[in-house]
């Protein structure tokens, strides 16, 4: 036989030492090690296209450029402010490089190396440029440039090396950089007639390291202060990019954790007092509740990657659910004191009679939460495990501490409890078979409504991935609107253990996309291929050049130069390049230095599995065009992975369909087994399960009425409610084994109402979070708990009346 937890256990010194040690360790972990993570990849499934997005997020999300958007009414002021911001950021410790103009690689000594960086269209124009007519046309334009008033000695020098301006041809068309931002080589990133301008910076360090993200944001704030100090007014300066988004996400999550946890405590306390009607009981319940939450937070601090955006909801849920145990323990203490037991004996009695049902209820709820461990989303797994652990830890803390505090508070015998009048109304409504049938039909009505009306529509499964409240994401939208591009781009990943092979495959994708962009089959793309193609790609392109037999065209170039009035001696280097074209692959000077290093970081990364090269494609979202683009990409690189936040919607819906069934089945099975063991009756276990069916249907109706849509995060809370809300039915059915249903309702009705409302308060606190996914999760949880309470209070007495007769709830022989 299991020995009751409370018989002399708490006064033992070793138990006090353990509690103190665990509390001290949890406090240290909470304040020293607890951190939240801005890594949104924890919200994604780790399979299919979504797995590719997770890999991209972890490899590239840490290196995304910081984009500063400046806007004003006067272009001259915007330009001056941009120059000031760029100057400050170039001296900032958090910034590796700054680019306020599109890169313009210096021409090499051999201008025929232009073929190494030319895509299909540029190669065609290069071939035209080295014909006799093409040479004369380009030389006429070169002569005009040299005669222009702005021409200087530097321009004269490079035009002498490359009088045909061959090296300009790969970049003469607009070059696309991050997120489709276009600019001609050497030009500033401007829009709206110069009233909007971008400054692009390459941050140092990972965006997922809080100190790095904070440093970038602070340095941009210093740049804004420098603009104001220079007397440049009327300029708005805004920041977006990976570091800004990560920092804003972390601040939002910290705010949500603090607000939801505090609000949950306040709302649960108010619900407790309103239903339990004994304010002093809060003094006995809140300290162990805080203690159990602290222990759970200590466990959360051990998560290696920090708390995810969904997992931070554990605190509010644990507080709301944890009060349940306190309600039943303190009620048992009051009952023992009314029976004449001394405060100490009453504390031991309360612990002895409640430890088994409360721990069983906590275990059922904890297992229901832990069933989320079968989910394919890491963030949801963390939420389930933390809530499950918190449910058990708070129950243990309350069993240990609440009776001791209560024995001190209840020195005087409490007065008899005043009867709850609403219980008499409920008994009257379910006291006869006819009324019981009517009550059951009313509770079952939502099942029929859902069958006719249908389940709530599935909303965007990505609702929690891009929090609408984040200012850097709003800035990103403004950049799209001003400079072109659009959200929802595809991310095409070419991977290989060897970096050059991966880059070669990405170059092939870029060549396949170029004609599609010209035909407007896609809105555009940006690739590293134009600025830094792989050595293999460069050699292949130079082979195209060599097929033109440039040495045979040297004399044609010489004649064209002479006819156009150029000095042949000054252009001797260009003539020698035609006679002896370079055969080696070439990297433009500074390509791996400060000028283009951020472009390399945006497109090339490495992880444990090898090199990853990303190409960013903006589809036009026409099914036929998108299908053509996918086919072209996979034809160029059959091993490429096409992903993106919009592209993984199907993957998330698949996860929702699979996990909802799996998690629901596990939770329902465990709850059924627990009910059978606790109630020792098949019929009464079936009654408890019937309350769940009514609850689920009521949730469906409420979501339809309130306009709450299903998505992958709020849908998965529904199976968890099986374990959380079954408590109400279990306590009512357990009490009905020992007495009449009327007495059971009077004894347990107010208590289960208190526990349900405090649980609902915990979920409801999440509605005030700024994170979209948590708000919906909290709304569904709160609605579900209230629906479960109403179902239990009506279905249990009505069903027992029909099954066992009006007065047979106390007949122990009815157990099966």
Report each predicted region and the residues it spans.
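Signature of alpha-helical transmembrane segments and their immediate interfacial
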Residues: 1-38, 404, 408, 412-461, ...
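Transmembrane alpha-helices and their membrane-interface boundaries in multi-pass membrane transporters
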Residues: 302, 318-331, 355-375, 379-418, ...
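Hydrophobic transmembrane alpha-helices and their membrane-interface caps
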Residues: 281-329, 684-732
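Pore- and gate-forming transmembrane helices of large, multi-pass membrane proteins
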Residues: 286, 338-375, 739-769, 789
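Solvent-exposed, non-transmembrane loop/terminal regulatory segments of multi-pass membrane proteins
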Residues: 29-73, 176-188, 428-437, 454-498, ...
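Extracytoplasmic
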Residues: 151-279, 507, 576-671
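Juxtamembrane segments of multi-pass membrane proteins
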Residues: 436-560
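Alpha-helical transmembrane helix bundles of large polytopic membrane transport and channel proteins
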Residues: 26-28, 83-198, 212, 519-600
């Amino acid at each position: 036989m299991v020995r009751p937890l409370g018989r002399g256990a708490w006064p033992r010194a070793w138990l006090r030492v353990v509690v103190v040690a665990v509390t001290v360790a949890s406090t240290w972990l909470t304040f020293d090690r607890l951190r939240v993570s801005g890594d949104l990849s924890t919200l994604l499934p780790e399979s299919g296209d979504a797995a590719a997005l997770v890999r991209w997020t972890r490899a590239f999300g840490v290196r995304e450029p910081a984009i500063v958007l400046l806007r004003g009414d006067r272009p001259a002021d915007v330009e001056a402010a941009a120059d000031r911001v760029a100057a400050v950021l170039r001296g900032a410790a958090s910034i590796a490089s700054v680019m306020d103009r599109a890169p313009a690689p210096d021409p090499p000594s051999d201008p025929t190396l232009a073929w190494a960086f030319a895509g299909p269209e540029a190669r065609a124009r290069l071939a035209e440029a080295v014909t006799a007519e093409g040479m004369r046309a380009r030389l006429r334009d070169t002569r005009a440039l040299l005669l222009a008033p702005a021409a200087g000695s530097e321009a004269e020098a490079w035009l002498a090396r490359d009088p045909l301006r061959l090296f300009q041809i790969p970049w003469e068309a607009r070059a696309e950089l991050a997120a489709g931002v276009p600019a001609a080589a050497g030009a500033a990133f401007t829009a709206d007639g110069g009233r909007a301008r971008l400054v692009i910076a390459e941050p140092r360090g990972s965006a997922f390291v809080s100190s790095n993200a904070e440093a970038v944001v602070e340095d941009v704030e210093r740049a804004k202060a420098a603009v104001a100090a220079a007397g440049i007014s009327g300029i708005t300066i805004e920041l977006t990019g990976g570091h800004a988004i990560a920092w804003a996400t972390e601040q939002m999550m910290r705010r949500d954790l603090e607000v939801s946890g505090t609000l949950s405590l306040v709302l649960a306390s108010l619900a407790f007092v309103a239903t339990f009607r004994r304010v002093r009981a809060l003094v006995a319940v809140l300290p162990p509740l805080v203690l159990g939450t602290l222990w759970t937070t200590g466990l959360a601090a051990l998560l290696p990657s920090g708390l995810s955006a969904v997992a931070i909801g554990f605190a509010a849920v644990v507080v709301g659910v944890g009060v349940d145990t306190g309600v039943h323990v303190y009620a048992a203490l009051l009952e023992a004191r009314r029976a004449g037991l001394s405060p100490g004996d009453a504390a031991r009695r309360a612990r002895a009679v409640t430890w088994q049902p409360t721990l069983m209820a906590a275990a059922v709820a904890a297992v229901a939460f832990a069933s989320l461990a079968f989910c394919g989303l890491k963030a949801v797994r963390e939420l389930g495990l933390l809530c499950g652990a918190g449910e058990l830890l708070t129950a243990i803390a309350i069993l240990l501490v609440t009776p001791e505090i209560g024995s001190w508070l209840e020195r005087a015998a409490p007065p008899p409890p005043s009867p709850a009048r609403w219980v008499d109304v409920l008994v009257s409504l379910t006291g006869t078979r006819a009324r019981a049938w009517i009550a059951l039909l009313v509770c079952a009505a939502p099942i029929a409504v859902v069958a006719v009306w249908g389940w709530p529509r599935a909303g965007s499964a990505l609702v929690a991935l891009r929090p609408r409240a984040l200012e850097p994401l709003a800035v990103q939208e403004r950049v799209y609107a001003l400079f072109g591009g659009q959200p929802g781009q595809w991310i095409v990943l070419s991977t290989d253990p060897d970096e050059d092979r991966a880059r070669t495959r990405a170059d092939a994708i870029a060549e396949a996309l170029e004609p599609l962009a010209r035909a407007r089959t896609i809105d555009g793309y940006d690739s590293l291929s134009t600025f830094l193609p792989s050595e293999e790609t460069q050699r292949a392109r130079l082979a195209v050049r060599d097929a033109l037999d440039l040495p045979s065209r040297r004399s044609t170039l010489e004649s064209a130069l002479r006819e156009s009035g150029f000095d042949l001696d000054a252009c001797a280097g260009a003539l020698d390049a035609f006679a002896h074209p370079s055969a080696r692959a070439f990297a433009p000077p500074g390509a791996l230095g400060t000028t283009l290093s951020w472009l390399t970081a945006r497109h090339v990364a490495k992880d444990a599995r090898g090199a990853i090269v990303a190409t960013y494609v903006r589809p036009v979202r026409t099914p036929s065009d998108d299908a053509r683009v996918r086919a072209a990409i996979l034809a160029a690189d059959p091993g490429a992975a096409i992903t993106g936040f919009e592209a993984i919607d199907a993957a998330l819906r698949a996860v929702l369909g699979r996990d909802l069934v799996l998690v629901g089945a596990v939770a329902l099975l465990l709850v059924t087994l627990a009910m059978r063991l606790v109630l020792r009756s098949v019929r009464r276990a079936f009654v408890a399960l019937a309350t769940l069916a009514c609850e689920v249907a009521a949730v469906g109706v409420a979501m339809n009425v309130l306009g709450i849509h299903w998505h992958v995060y709020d849908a998965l809370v529904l199976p968890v409610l099986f374990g959380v809300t079954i408590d109400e039915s279990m306590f009512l059915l357990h009490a009905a084994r020992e007495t009449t249903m009327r007495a059971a309702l009077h004894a347990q009705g107010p208590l289960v109402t208190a526990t349900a409302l405090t649980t609902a308060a915990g979920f409801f606190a999440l509605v005030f979070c700024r994170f979209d996914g948590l708000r919906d999760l909290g709304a569904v949880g709160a609605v579900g708990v209230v629906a479960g309470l109403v179902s239990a209070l009506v279905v249990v007495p009505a069903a027992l009346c029909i099954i066992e007769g009006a007065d047979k709830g106390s007949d122990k022989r009815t157990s099966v």
